[in-house]
């Protein structure tokens, strides 16, 4: 009997492709940190003195100036990308223009790169609140940035701005000392030493630096938006909102338009319709629109085979030890993870319901150390919980790597070539595309 084969080949079959190799071999502690900007570049720090940037569109690496890290490079070293440019803060002004026109900003910075395609946020002064594309810039002291679209009012010496360009925070390992914690600014091609005071005396087991930025994949990620119905010197109110009490603590609110546009504040408390913040420079009113997002001012560090969790305040350049209401059940060990989950798809209503949103509220962390344990930190509630998921028979240890994309965490199990995908909305682990060529050995180092 004649038959017809109606089967069709699978479209978009998962497959692995080789990319350009790092110019030099990796070593224990080598880590990769991805920017969250439109070019999605990756910084690789190979040692205290070697670093490279990878351009995925060109599949190539370029060395950059030495990180100049102190300490003994190895396990525990970590890096993460933040959204703010040199000298910028969340609650105060620091980058002030020296003049300009309706299409140009004369900066107070020495820019070292072509920043076309990136954005600039106007914090105060003429055109406050505007988020503009950079069309071109000069490479010199007091660099001139040309922006689009043209604005109604010329920029001036009262313009306060932020370049929304990559900024990588890098933490070394071994015995910590001055220059163990540094930041690389992409726009100026400079490294700056930051304070390590408040961290442990030494770091020697896997660790993670975690950012909660307002900008994701080249644009602002807002968890709630609206227009104020009233405000005071320390509050913003929108009557009719039905937020859960305290759900926005440690998030940030940005005034996107109207009175007070450009201001950003950390939320210290909230009721069903009221946000409490530090004192506004200009009190918002009924013309003020706002957006709530992740907090650019905080970094978190977990790891070092300890349950202790640290938070870095970028504005103050200080570290503090957090005291969660419920401590983490087990210390993170070799092969641990740490990711802020912010973009579970909109189809998951419980993750995106503004009145009790889950997106942006939690940091998830696999314990590592030969276990399958998964823990979750509540940023607003300052508490840890252990997450039940299935199947949970696979364990993770030295060399396991993780990469977050939207609502899924992709997991490379050490060097053996097996991959898994963890779905946060479903609390479920799935098998994923097997690598055809396992690595020769497990790599100790961070990925972000």
Cite the ranges covered by each PLM segment.
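Beta-propeller domains
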Residues: 6, 10-15, 46-57, 61
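Conserved short beta-strand element of beta-propeller blades
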Residues: 1, 19-46, 51-53, 64-88, ...
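Short loop/turn segments that connect beta-strands within beta-propeller blades
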Residues: 14, 56-59, 185-189, 313-317, ...
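Autoprocessing Asn-cyclization modules and mimics
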Residues: 21, 67-69, 84-157, 196-199, ...
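A short, compositionally biased
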Residues: 4-6, 48, 112-118, 176-178, ...
